[in-house]
Amino acid sequence: MITLKQALSLSQDELETLKNEIDAKVRASDLNAYIKAPSLNGASAKGVPILIKDNISVKGWEITCSSKILEGYVAPYHASAIENLHQNGMAGFGLSNMDEFAMGSTTESSCYGITKNPRDKNIVPGGSSGGSAAAVAGGLTVAALGSDTGGSIRQPASYCGCVGLKPTYGRVSRYGVIAYRSSFDQIRPITQNVEDASILFDAISGYDSKDSTSANLKPTHTFINLIRDKRFKIAILRDHINDASNEVQLAYENTIKALKEMGHEVVEKKMLDSHYQISIYYIISMAEASSNLARFDGVRYGRRAQNVKDLKELYLKSRSEGFGDEVKRRIMLGNFVLSSGYYDAYYLKAQQMRLMIKEQYNKIFEEVDLIFTPVAPTTAYLFNYHASPLEMYLSDIYTIGANLSGLPALSLPVAKDPLGLPIGMQFIAKAFDEQSLLDVSYALEQELDLKLD
């Protein structure tokens, strides 16, 4: 597939040809990366076609978060990120499959069915932005937008072998994203390479008065400022990788060696056990989810249950029929930790620990420029692999720290396991220092001669 950098130089006629080629590929593909053929909605404007995750509002498109409860909901406005695409020569073209309401790490919980990994169709593409990552890796789109709440960009990018960038919380407007976890949610790019990630990030970032969490900063210009030969002081967290597979640990050590050979200074640091971060993250995120999803009740928009006697039955039946099992599980757990008897014991304590994690990152960044860790403890696994939801939650063990702290992070494919499955590593940077993330990743990508094949 043509890269985003190349596509931006195409004429309007050439772009129409490209859209037709993408549409034909999607119709012929069995990956189920798209919810439906992109030509059925058409493009949101003229420009380079970008795949959009099904939780980002595009005016006139049915946006469902891959959930039955939002069947028939048509977005009445563009998300700010979509408007920014239009201003930078790009446009939405197609909606990607995802875990229902972004609650999952495998893209198995979508009401539209599973998405397959183009590297091996028997394994998961990751999630929740699995459709976006599978489409990029499978040559079905130039680039894609997803959302990263606890690793939902970086983990599927790692599993599928592409680049996933999570900007600093507040750098990209959340306006127009259907809320799951408001203190975590943000729109992010998934691309074929680091240059494209930089271009797409510059296009969608910027202050937005419609989003109260938007940082009032100048627009970014990371692409024109990409530098290959800059040297950084990088922290590694060896005590964090004990849960990783042998293949991931080997790739981690080999990449550390490559970074040293490139002239970067590598030092060891320690942090709070990542298992604690998992607990903290899920307590807070489930609490926020139960609050945000209370609005979906069958009254104003989306699925409305039929043959009900009263308002209470309408609520119960609409939500029971509309939500999938994983969403129901998280709503119930969220309501539990917010209940009067358990608020202090769980939710309040988790928020206090979240501040402690932020302080730990800040302390490390007083001495280093970047932190380097694996993205996931294993490569992608078979469908229906996890015996329990808890096992699935543990696949986020290395990614959630950046989300809890609101820090920028980038997933880069660095190796393959013996079965040929991609292995991704991530860099984490100081708040609003996406430039350093992109610089070091761009240089490493060139050093390892990484190509999306």
From Swiss-Prot:
PROSITE patterns: AMIDASES (PS00571). Keywords: ATP-binding, Ligase, Nucleotide-binding, Protein biosynthesis. The keyword Protein biosynthesis applies. One of its GO terms (cellular component) is glutamyl-tRNA(Gln) amidotransferase complex. The keyword Transcription regulation does not apply. One of its GO terms (molecular function) is glutaminyl-tRNA synthase (glutamine-hydrolyzing) activity. One of its GO terms (biological process) is translation. InterPro entries: Amidase (IPR000120), Amidase_CS (IPR020556), Amidase_dom (IPR023631), AS_sf (IPR036928), GatA (IPR004412). It catalyses: L-glutamyl-tRNA(Gln) + L-glutamine + ATP + H2O = L-glutaminyl-tRNA(Gln) + L-glutamate + ADP + phosphate + H(+). Its EC number is 6.3.5.7. The active site is at residues 53, 128, 152. Allows the formation of correctly charged Gln-tRNA(Gln) through the transamidation of misacylated Glu-tRNA(Gln) in organisms which lack glutaminyl-tRNA synthetase. The reaction takes place in the presence of glutamine and ATP through an activated gamma-phospho-Glu-tRNA(Gln). Heterotrimer of A, B and C subunits. Belongs to the amidase family. GatA subfamily. This is Glutamyl-tRNA(Gln) amidotransferase subunit A. It comes from Helicobacter pylori (strain J99 / ATCC 700824). The gene is gatA.
